[in-house]
């Protein structure tokens, strides 16, 4: 008899099991939804790509020189000719020359008499004869240098191609053999009406057998001058500076500065000196009989400018640009420095490194001529628009409204926002300034939204209620306008404080290449000198927003600010900070970041609001109405001979500029600073709070230790009266001349006929038959 089978019947699932499985199911669904959100919102977001630009690599043809019975440059072949210039080359040496038909001057890429140099040793002699130097890493991350003469031309490892209005040299540097590291680099010359365009398109660079080019120095001795020449080099040091030829400062370091400052992701955390960045992508060489303006047209964000004098490496005074093609980063493997390895970016930055050498005629002499030519070019390109004349210059002042401070509730610490200046009090400041005779005023309102001065990321706009809310903000704007001024609201897009709990630092922050960690910065710790400190306040530390997500934040802000009745937007960082993102899966170079930034400046301009930039770089000029914290001096470098208002000579009459905060100028220096404002043609600029500045002593803004409006009102009005007394006659006028005279006297000339003499000495001085009082100025032609 067969045994019967019993069927087991499952009982009902226990309540506990059902709850656990339900929780797990919800968790899986939530996790899946979040992953979808994460990938859509962060990984696949690519709006920044809409702003990226590209370039084309021109196909080469057979090089054919232009026949010429009597060459203007002996032993050279004619390549191209324009209305003003002739382009020549010497195929045996790859030297290029530009002959100026207007004055008969010839400018060479390399000195023809290099062998006669009295200073250059073997390596420097090689450099004198080279069109560029390249710096590279090998497969073991050991760096080296190659120069075109010894590593290419001398070996006859180069060829020539014809291109439109020019010539392309193809250099093969190194040992061209199996398994030997070598490089192929194109160098292009194109002639235009009054300038030569020189470029190295990185798409044409080839690297063989584990060689990695990380920097190229281009045409180190183009237009270089000798001991016999008189003149100077113009460099974009702060406001601008000059280095006199043969100035004898042979122990001083050469001038070398990154354009738009070094990429924060390539900079050292340790800050040993604080320098004003180079805001202009240009330099110049000014001789008695000719002047050459050099502008970096493409790749400026990855470039630096170097200048030096004769008697150090060779007999020449020189200036040249260098371009960074990639960086190497430290990767710490096991927690201590002994395990550090160099990680090299695999691909060079895709950029058409382009430099324009403009040969100026007698109309554009000296550094004033360089500035005038460049300004006229920007006007012609639609990047600068002439301002209308006004009765007075504007008075600039920042108003700190909301500030974060630590508070406690039931033993828990948190940040809350308190008012240093609410919107009604800011109205009172504007009214009192107007009553003091300051009708033309520009208010920069800081800390008005999203939690105060160190506000949360700007994808939302929450106007702080305790300050007065939206209605109070618009009433404040109405008051400033009625007083004859403009009000700008301040916003930081790229520097996001660590106090913002809603920002996804891991996904949206810019990252380093080596270890891949998020870049974080802060203030300088006076003990360690590292620039990553909060000095006790988390708000002082910040992450840098990746350029990938900049369009999202700017777009959302632009949509919201357009609905608020304020005159302008003050950009705390967008016009002056340029950062890459070295995230390995989606790397964005500084040059690509520049494309994105320009696109966002256009978006903000389209809101119809005026734009203010903070010490704006030259790429922001086309969008900027006003500039605060404009450079009014150069960095005190030993090789520098004098500071000049190069920045202001380009912008004055087209963009209104203001100085840095005058609250923090030493009282003994204030008289000289006031004269400095008059010389450079910039307005005074203060920072105010209605409450006493001591209220901020236990906040992240304790460095603003003297801002109380009631203490500064009379002093500010007096300073404004002094500066306005001179500059009100040149509002809307272009600065066309600047002369450094004897005995600490400066002469500034404007295109409306006004001339201002400034005397920095403590005795009255004579200039052009006029007497200028001690520590004062004199107006002529008003």
Locate each region found by the language model.
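Hydrophobic membrane-insertion alpha-helices, especially the h-region
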Residues: 22-35
């Amino acid at each position: 008899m067969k045994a019967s089978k019993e069927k087991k019947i499952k009982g009902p699932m226990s309540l506990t099991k059902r709850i656990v499985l339900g929780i797990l199911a919800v968790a899986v669904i939530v996790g899946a939804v979040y992953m979808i959100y994460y990938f859509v919102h962060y990984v696949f977001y690519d709006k920044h790509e809409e702003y990226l630009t590209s370039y084309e690599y021109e196909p080469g043809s057979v090089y054919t020189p232009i026949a010429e019975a009597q060459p203007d440059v002996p032993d050279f072949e004619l390549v191209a000719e324009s209305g003003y210039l002739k382009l020549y080359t010497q195929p045996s040496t790859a030297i290029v020359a530009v002959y100026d038909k207007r004055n008969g001057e010839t400018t060479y890429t390399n000195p023809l008499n290099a062998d006669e140099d009295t200073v250059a040793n073997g390596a420097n002699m090689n450099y004198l004869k080279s069109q560029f130097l390249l710096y590279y890493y090998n497969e073991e991350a050991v760096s080296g240098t190659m120069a075109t003469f010894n590593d290419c031309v001398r070996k006859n490892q180069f060829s020539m191609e014809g291109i439109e209005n020019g010539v392309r040299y193809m250099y093969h540097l190194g040992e061209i053999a199996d398994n030997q590291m070598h490089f192929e680099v194109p160098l292009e010359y194109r002639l235009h009406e009054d300038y030569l365009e020189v470029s190295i398109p990185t798409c044409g660079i080839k690297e063989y057998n584990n060689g990695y080019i990380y920097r190229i120095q281009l045409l180190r001795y183009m237009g270089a001058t000798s001991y016999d020449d008189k003149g100077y080099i113009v460099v974009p040091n702060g406001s601008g500076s000059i280095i006199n030829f043969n100035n004898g400062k042979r122990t001083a370091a050469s001038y070398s500065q990154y354009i738009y400052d070094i990429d924060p992701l390539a900079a050292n955390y340790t800050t040993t000196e604080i320098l004003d960045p180079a805001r202009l992508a240009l330099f110049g060489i000014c001789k008695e009989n000719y002047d050459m303006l050099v502008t970096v047209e493409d790749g400026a964000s990855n470039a630096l400018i170097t200048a030096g004098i004769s008697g150090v490496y060779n007999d020449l005074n020189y200036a040249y640009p260098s371009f960074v093609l990639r960086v190497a980063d430290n990767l710490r493997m096991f927690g201590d420095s002994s395990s550090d390895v160099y990680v090299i970016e695999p691909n060079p930055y895709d950029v058409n490194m382009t430099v324009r050498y403009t040969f100026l005629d007698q109309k554009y002499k000296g550094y004033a001529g360089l500035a005038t030519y460049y300004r006229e070019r920007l006007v012609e390109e639609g990047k600068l628009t002439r301002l209308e004349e006004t009765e007075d210059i504007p008075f600039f002042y920042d108003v700190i409204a909301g500030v974060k401070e630590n508070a406690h509730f039931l033993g828990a610490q948190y940040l809350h926002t308190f008012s240093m200046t609410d919107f009604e009090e800011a109205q009172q400041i504007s009214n009192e300034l107007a009553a003091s005779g300051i009708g033309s005023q520009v208010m920069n309102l800081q800390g008005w939204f999203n939690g105060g001065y160190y506000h949360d990321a700007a994808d939302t706009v929450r106007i702080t209620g305790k300050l007065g809310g939206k209605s109070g903000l618009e009433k404040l704007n109405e008051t400033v306008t009625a007083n004859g001024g403009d009000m700008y609201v301040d916003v930081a897009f790229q520097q996001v404080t660590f106090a913002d709990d809603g920002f996804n630092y891991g996904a949206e922050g810019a990252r380093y290449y080596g270890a891949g960690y998020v870049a974080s910065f802060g203030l300088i710790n006076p003990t360690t000198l590292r620039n990553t400190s909060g000095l006790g306040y988390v708000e002082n530390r910040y992450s840098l927003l990746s350029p990938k997500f900049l369009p999202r934040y700017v777009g959302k802000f632009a949509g919201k600010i357009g609905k608020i009745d304020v005159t302008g937007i003050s950009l705390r960082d967008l016009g002056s900070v340029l950062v890459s993102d070295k995230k390995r899966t989606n790397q964005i170079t500084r040059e690509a970041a520049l494309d994105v930034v320009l696109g966002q400046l256009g978006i903000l301009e389209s809101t119809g609001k005026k734009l203010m930039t903070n010490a704006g770089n030259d790429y922001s000029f086309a969008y900027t109405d006003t500039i605060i914290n404009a450079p009014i001096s150069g960095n005190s470098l030993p090789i520098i001979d004098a500071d000049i208002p190069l920045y202001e000579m380009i912008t004055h009459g087209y963009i209104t500029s203001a100085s840095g905060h005058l609250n923090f100028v030493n009282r003994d220096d204030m008289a000289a600073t006031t004269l400095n404002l008059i010389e450079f043609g910039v307005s005074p600029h203060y920072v105010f709070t209605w409450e006493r500045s001591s209220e901020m002593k236990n906040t992240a803004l304790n460095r603003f230790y003297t801002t109380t409006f009631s203490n500064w009102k009379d002093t500010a009005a007096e300073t404004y009266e002094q500066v306005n007394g001179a500059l009100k006659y040149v509002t809307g006028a272009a600065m066309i001349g600047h002369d450094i005279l004897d005995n600490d006297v400066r002469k500034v000339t404007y295109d409306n006929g006004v001339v201002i003499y400034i005397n920095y000495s403590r005795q009255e001085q004579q200039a052009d038959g006029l007497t200028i009082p001690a520590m004062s100025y004199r107006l002529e032609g008003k």
